[in-house]
Amino acid sequence: LLFYYPLLSGKVLFQSDIRQYDGMSRQLKDYRAQTGEETYWIDNAFGGMPTYQLGAKYPADFLSPIYSFFRILPRPAHILFIYLLGFYLLMTVLKFPWQIGLFGSMAFGFSTYLLIILQVGHNTKALAISFIPFVIAGMLLLFRKQWFWGFILTSLSFAMQIRSNHYQHQSSVLNILSTSIALGVYNII
């Protein structure tokens, strides 16, 4: 909270990519305001493109209430919170003492690259990265035969990771999951 104190006092972090997003998604927002309906195609960006990356809303989005829980903090402080929480949970699942878990989560959350992508507004990338420790922690719980919590954590965090809408890191998580499953099957055989 101290790191993002200016945000908590009402100031707004200028994120260049978010400003560009506002321009790219203007037609989508105007259409939604005029008709009350959702469009999945706009023609003002790149000569026409789908709106899946520009803030389209989906009727069966059950993950929004979960994501709203993290949005109690202003953007992008809420993403930093998810970084810290996810890595601390991973360290806890790995059975590190809480002091090492706290230090590890601070080292992860305040690493230079993760802060830079927040500064410039790569929020979807940051969100995708923030849920990776949750996915890994869930997989570890599954390997330890803690089926219920492992399934809940893996499926919810992977769904949130997909919801972040950043395909590059979704493929990375799929690689982690498939490698983990392959190693698990190998150890069983």
Predicted regions and their residues:
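Alpha-helical structural context
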Residues: 34, 69, 93-94, 163
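Membrane-embedded helix bundles of polyisoprenyl
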Residues: 86-89, 93, 99-188
